Amino acid sequence: ADDGATRQTKWGPLSAADRELIKKVRLATLWEMTIAQEAMQRGSSRRVREISREIAEQHHALDEQARDLAERLDVRLPVRPTADQQKWMADISGRSGRDYDRTYVKWLRLAHGQIFAFIGQVRGSTQNTLVRKFAEACNAAVLNHQRLLESTGLAGPEAFPDPPEV
């Protein structure tokens, strides 16, 4: 179990937040890569099928990076999606046609919106050079995925997390 302490590595200090980013990205890839691959086949619109290919490919690359980083930094990774992520997958997979597309975009856009701010916080605070580079790759991918999902025209209000408190 992670004790929350900052650990020293040859790439700089590794904080609990740094480790959490690696774990969160792994969790995201476990369900988003799978469901994007499904949407490449089951999406009812050509646009959903197109964006799903790009999302799946980028999640595959992020997953490889997360697993490599975890090995180098001795971070234990999850092996299955969370209960919520499994519910989202079941909700998407249980639908068809345009309803499938809308539900797919809703859950993926919501998940990307939730992790986006955390990636920025870690990038802004990490002193670990490996995590910094990883956070930059994650930031670029998540921003791109949000744009792709929004480009479908199916991202309604329920696809966005609550705004931050000020």
Stretches found by the model and what they are:
Residues 1-166:
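His/Met- and acidic-residue-enriched segments that coordinate or traffic transition-metal cofactors
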